[in-house]
């Protein structure tokens, strides 16, 4: 007898895996009909755009790329400034002999009197220090020179860039970025999982081939459970974050029935899956250290923006196809004003810090406690306050809470070593002012991380210790994912429509621009020799915008 559930799962997985391989023929056909808006359509945008140097020339990928193209043609000082920043960045990311070589190269190329590439735009004390720099004070002096170089670029070069064809091209891309987004913009594939308000499925952008995960929140379910505020807060936080170690939001839109968040596709499974479903329980130590380094960096990025994660646990740490991990599910994250605290109870029981259970004031301390619990679980295959027999004998929630408040974790598993025990103990200090990460300290400086070069890690230059197999779907079978019951008796009003509109803002600049670059569409549409196809609707031709669907 045919197992239809198994067949459905096979079909879903096959289509999903095939989509990740791409269809170049279909993609080329679609792209021939695309074109950027005409320059004259960008006049209002030129006036309204915030002329912030850091945003336009450093953070936004297309803006950064076009500003660098301008600098390469903007005269000797502009060219030299760009070369210096590139060479200094190379030095910052180098190690050992390569770092020494890069330092010597910078001194000889930019600091020696009479050099063709001397930094002539430097003035005063910084110029004097640059010319006299030595190996001993190199790092300190170059920090000052870097700041002065950026100040130079923010002046006349930035002003002249805004009057150049390169900035005109940037405005065309910004106008294109504003295109309306709907479900017709994507192909939809298998369901990856379900949560309290909806499901997560794999999607693919039709025009670029980029794969994403789409979190579809049921509008009626949100309204019934009063989840609108939480959904909007998660969306706004995701828009703000820009870290390799936190899932990126690329698009936000709505359909008749759902609010949709389109985010990084993390198809390597979550860490909980890797702890409990692959081989022996637990994860190898080199992987644990690597993942924790990325997690800690992601948490610090949130804390720098006064955002507390509040749901740190292995289940919320996802791996991508390259084996890099990111924090996900920011539904419980909250922004806390500087100097303020909260005492709200939130999180997952086994990872809750004492201050959450006691409902006493807290800020970022709760994330470091939860990270300590997560490291323990990755090593041992069980959480520190449930113990190894939790599966055989269910430990009641009240008992777990009692242990968190009154007991110290036991380190009986054979894979615990001295450094690992120490960092876990430091994270699981019951008093906040004694806890690692809560004493104006950086947890990444603990000896446990001695094998990690964090500058290179943040630049994405360290190869992961484990890479997912490309032909494996690290997600539950579609038949194992429970269906939702129908929501009846829920109607929408003007207030709901206003909320949906506030949520549905389309493309998110940084992630969208990176997609355009990574998939080659930026180079293709920016090619001055490219011949535009006659494809597209009459409305497209009249407006000069691209054919979207």
Curated annotation (Swiss-Prot):
Domain of life: Eukaryota
Record has Flavoprotein as a keyword: no
Domain Protein kinase: 186-449
Biased composition (Basic and acidic residues): 527-543
Note: Although the protein is present in a diversity of vertebrates ranging from bony fish to mammals, the mouse and rat orthologous proteins do not exist.
Family per similarity comment: Belongs to the protein kinase superfamily. AGC Ser/Thr protein kinase family. GPRK subfamily.
Protein name: Rhodopsin kinase grk7a
Species for this entry: Danio rerio
